[in-house]
Each structure stands twice: as C-alpha cells, then as structure tokens.
C-alpha cells in the first residue's frame, strides 16, 4: 500500500487482529480478502492495534503489504514508518526504521514491577521475561518462531499465576493499581502494563492524519471484546464483531450502546462490515 497522506481517502480504519481480522483458530485473513483489496484500491490507511509485539507485526504487515503505522502491546507504543508523515512527530524516538511514540513505561521497568508486586502480596507469578522460547511456546501454544517474536517486548509483560487464590490475585491487581499500573486478563495469561491504552494511541494517530491530510476523515475501529473498549471508544464509528458462538460481549454493549454490531465473527464479519462502511451504511 502506498502512503495515504497523498491519497483522497475518506476513512481511517483501526483494527484488532486475533478474532477480528484474523481467524481465532487459524490466524487466516482469507475471508477478508475482498475488503482488504477494496481498502488498498481506495488508499485507505489500515492501522493494526493489537497486543502483538513489533517483531510479530512486522511479519504480518509484510504478508499483507501494509506500510502504515501500527500500535503494539495494547497501546504501549505507535510505530510510524520513517518518512510516512511529512511533519514533525512530537515526542517520537528513532527505533530501527520507525519513529516510535511511547505511551507505556519501558519493558525493564514493567518486569521489575511484576516481580516486586508478586513479592509484596505473596503471589507466585511467571512472566515472559522468566521463560525461554521453548517454555513460552509450551505455555502459549505458539510455534517456536512465533514464541521468539512474542518474546521481543517493549512495553507490556504477559504472565500467569501459578496456583494463586482469587484473594491473592485481587491483592496483586490492587497493588499494581496503587503503583499506577494496569492488569488485564486474556485467557490464561494476564498482562501488566503502565501508562497506556489503545484509545490514547488511536487518538494521537487520528490527529496526525488530520493535520497531514487537512480534510474530513472518518475514523472506524473494529474489535470483538472488552479489551478493545478503549480502541472502540476513540473513533467516530465503533464496530463490535460477535464472539465465535455468535454472541456479543455484553460489557462492551453496556458501555457503548450505539456500537455497530457486525454480522459474523472474525474475518467474515470484518469483510462484510468494512464493505458496508464504504457504502455509507
């Protein structure tokens, strides 16, 4: 995809990946090919907003020929390809081939806090930084190569509790909040982070695009669960896709009663909804 700043795109599309654009079981996006091709034809920026690391996203972006900025590790940072915007990106630091705007604390601080909080409340936790690639693969179901990419973190630390009671887990969460940190759960794994949210990163990017294009842009976001609430709350049109069983996350519906409900889970629903957006529905 070419740089959108020189194209007459009317939309910005922000998308979660696993369970949204990507099939939750196979990680395939084949059911969304029609919409992806239409996005490219129109020159619409497609910005991935995900819990994945920069290393993981670089591979996926190459496969999808995506040259746009992306948001990693639950809003920890924005990575903007060098030369993408013809303006100064305030607060950005050079990281490899990108300008990086960081919202989260450095990874070393987060892992140190994980160990300190665990010791404080007497919780037995195991973080990614304490596991090698083989152990991460065994605990997550990822392949060895995928596990190595997931291990290359900048902001957010996945971890699990080893036999902790609900009371100890609650104490851990409260102790983390006392330190100004966030604890979220995604399946078996929990995530410790600080100072960031997906919506904050999305808002920052929307402002950059509008400064560059200087025309009306409609921001659209797609997600499927509570962890995407911040993302969905930050755009003009929020789209909630159903869970694999066809149900919608009631916690999102209660907070965003006017959210657009997608017609099907995963890439099938993603495809249909994006095409409807372009038709003005």
Model-assigned labels for residue ranges:
Residues 1-15, 63:
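Non-catalytic pre-domain segments flanking phosphatase-related domains
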Residues 3-9, 29, 189-281:
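Mg2+-dependent phosphoryl-transfer enzymes with acidic/Ser/Thr/Gly-rich catalytic loops
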Residues 24-28:
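Conserved ATPase-coupling elements of RecA-like P-loop NTPase cores
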Residues 29-127, 243:
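Active-site phosphate-binding/coordination module
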Residues 31, 56-59, 135, 201, ...:
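Phosphate- and divalent-cation-binding pockets in alpha/beta enzyme and binding domains
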Residues 45, 182, 237-238:
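Residue-level detector of anion-binding/catalytic polar loops
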Residues 117-220, 226:
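Conserved acidic, metal-coordinating active-site core of Asp-based
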């Amino acid at each position: 995809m070419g740089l959108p700043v020189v194209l007459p795109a009317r939309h910005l599309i922000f998308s979660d990946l696993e369970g949204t654009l990507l099939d939750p079981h196979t990680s395939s996006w084949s059911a969304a090919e029609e919409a992806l091709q239409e996005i490219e034809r129109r020159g619409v920026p497609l910005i991935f907003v995900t819990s994945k690391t920069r290393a993981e996203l670089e591979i996926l972006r190459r496969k999808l020929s995506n040259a746009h900025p992306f948001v990693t590790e639950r809003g920890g940072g924005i990575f903007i390809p060098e030369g993408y915007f013809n303006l100064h990106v305030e607060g950005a630091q050079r990281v490899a081939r990108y300008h990086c705007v960081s919202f989260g604390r450095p990874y070393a601080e987060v892992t140190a806090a994980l160990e300190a909080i665990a010791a404080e409340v007497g919780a037995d936790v195991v973080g990614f930084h304490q596991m090698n690639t083989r152990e991460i693969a065994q605990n997550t179901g990822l392949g060895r190569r995928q596990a190595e990419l997931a291990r290359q973190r900048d902001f957010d630390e996945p971890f699990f509790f080893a036999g902790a009671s609900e009371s100890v887990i609650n104490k851990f969460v409260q102790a983390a909040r006392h330190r100004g940190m966030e604890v979220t759960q995604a399946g078996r794994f929990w995530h410790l982070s600080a100072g960031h949210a997906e919506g904050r990163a999305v808002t920052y990017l929307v402002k950059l695009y509008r400064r560059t294009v200087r025309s009306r842009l409609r921001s659209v976001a797609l997600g499927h669960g509570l962890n995407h609430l911040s993302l969905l709350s930050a755009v003009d049109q929020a789209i909630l896709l159903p869970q694999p069983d066809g149900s919608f996350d009631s916690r999102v519906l209660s907070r965003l009663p006017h959210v657009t409900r997608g017609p099907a889970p995963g890439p099938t629903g993603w495809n249909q909804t994006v095409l409807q957006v372009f038709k003005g529905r």
